[in-house]
Design a protein with these regions (language model features):
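Carbohydrate-recognition beta-sandwich/jelly-roll modules
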Residues: 1-25
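Aromatic- and carboxylate-enriched substrate-binding clefts and catalytic-loop regions
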Residues: 24-196
C-alpha cells in the first residue's frame, strides 16, 4: 500500500494554513488504518505504519486542536469484497441479492461496494469509539445511508437500524462528525461535512 499523505504531511499542511491566517480548521484524516482506504480489513483497529503510527496521529491532533478540530474518518457502512465476508457480513436486499453500489467507472480498483449488516455497523462504531477514545471520529457513510437487511431469519428494518444507530452514536463520548447527514443524526453531530 502506498501512503499518499502521512501524519507529518498533514501537520505541515495545517501549520502552513495557520501561518497564512487560516484557523479554526476541521481536519479529517482518512486512510489511517493499516491497509489504507481500500485495503483495510473492515474490522481492523490498527493504525497504518506508513502514515506515522498512532504517535504521529496524536501529534497531528494536538497541533490541529490548538484552534480547530481533528477527526479520524472511517467508513462504517460500506466495504468492498476484500474487506468483508459477503456471505455473512453483507446486507441482503429485498430481491434476495446482496445490496451493492456499482461504480460508474469500471477502471476503479473496486467497482462494487457492499453494505455491511446493521450489527456489523453498530459493533464497528462501538469498537472504534472505545479504542480511539481520545480522538474525534468521523463516520463516513453513516449519515448518508439508512437501509434494511432482508437476510432470511435475521431481517432488520430501517426503523430498527435507525434506532440502533441513534442509541450507539448517542453513547459515543468524543466528538462525532458525519458526511451527507440525514436529519435524524443532526442532534448527535459536532460537525457534518459534504452537504449537497
Amino acid at each position: 500500500v502506498d501512503t499518499l499523505t502521512t501524519s507529518r504531511n498533514a501537520l505541515d499542511f495545517a501549520e502552513r494554513f495557520r501561518k497564512e491566517g487560516v484557523s479554526n480548521l476541521s481536519l479529517v484524516f482518512r486512510g489511517w488504518q493499516s491497509g489504507g482506504i481500500s485495503k483495510a480489513d473492515y474490522d481492523t483497529l490498527k493504525v497504518g505504519s506508513g502514515i506515522g503510527k498512532e504517535n504521529g496521529l496524536s501529534e497531528l491532533k494536538k497541533s490541529v486542536e490548538k484552534d480547530g478540530r481533528f477527526y479520524l474518518a472511517t467508513e462504517v457502512v460500506t466495504a468492498n469484497d476484500k474487506q468483508i465476508n459477503l456471505r455473512s457480513e453483507a446486507v441482503t436486499a429485498i430481491t434476495s441479492k446482496l445490496a451493492v453500489i456499482n461504480a460508474q467507472d469500471n477502471d476503479v480498483m473496486f467497482p462494487e461496494t457492499y453494505f455491511a449488516k446493521p450489527n456489523k455497523v453498530i459493533d464497528r462504531i462501538t469498537r472504534l469509539s472505545k479504542r480511539f477514545d481520545s480522538f474525534n471520529l468521523s463516520f463516513v457513510g453513516l449519515g448518508a445511508y439508512l437501509y434494511s437487511d432482508y437476510t432470511r431469519d435475521a431481517s432488520v428494518s430501517r426503523l430498527k437500524f435507525k434506532k440502533q444507530v441513534e442509541k450507539t452514536v448517542s453513547a459515543v463520548k468524543q466528538g462525532v462528525a458525519f458526511g451527507n447527514i440525514n436529519s435524524y443524526l443532526w442532534q448527535y453531530a459536532d460537525e457534518y461535512f459534504d452537504i449537497p
